[in-house]
Amino acid sequence: MNRLRAVFALMVIATGSLFAQTAIPAASMYLNQSRPGMTPKVFAPDRVSLKDHYEYGSVFSNDGKEFYYAVIINSKPQIRCIRFEKNAWTAPKIIIASEKYEYNDPFLSPDGKRLYFISDRSANGQGQKKDFDIWYIERKQDGWSDVPINAGPAINSEKNEYYMSFTKNGTMYFSSNGGTSAATDKNYDIRSSAYSKGKFQAFRKLSGNVNTENYEADVFVSPDEQYVIFCAERPEGLGAGDLYISFKSKTGEWQKAKNMGSIINTGGYEFCPFVTSDGKYLFFSRDGDIFWVKAEVIETLR
């Protein structure tokens, strides 16, 4: 028995050492970038937010070892990834791209086994481009699956679906102008769809405290579903598109959304928000670059 206990102890120690070796050193987190304060700064200007490219929509994996983002090349958005391997960050690698279709708004499922995105690709990937749907590819041992899978009719409509994020239980938040008329085609609303028994359920629109007759899209929901941050185009905004935030009340209702103010918003266009899994940083896009700021800015708006 003593011998078995000793062997078991050695296994535990070895396993712990293995995990310690695979963790990212604190200084190397976030692509080795110096951390921001309460004022947003451009993220990785030497590697991601380049002057001659238009970058937007970004997400880190929960373990911090993968960074996905969209970049426009020759007028066509593509999705790239930078990974932490062998104690260093790799060069950006194209995950999915096309000369015919657009691919953007990457976001990982809560378990990291799926990479979701939007695309105007045809159903079989060969015909003419169509409206934007939400699609995903699945993680394999050596990378990602080759053929995108449509997220299905509970999510996608005859019109456009944009940008998605997830609660820890797998509920998807996204935006769509599905069901609108030609006169209200720009009226995108934020929706949610629970994930149950291997499929997404019928969507629900968020209340009028979030959705209006204006454009609301690019929604990030906190994993505990206690707040949403989204882009809206409203007359009272500071720019063409601003980030707004709505907190959930103690009774489970979404409170009236607030403009996140001049700390975040400018006369430009702010969109594609994302908060890192450690809760430390808010990422968002502005006029062709990716920015980040301390997530403490969220608490100042409660």
Task: Give, region by region, the residue ranges found by the protein language model.
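Bacterial Sec-dependent N-terminal signal peptides
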Residues: 1-23
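Short, conserved micro-motifs composed of acidic
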Residues: 21-302
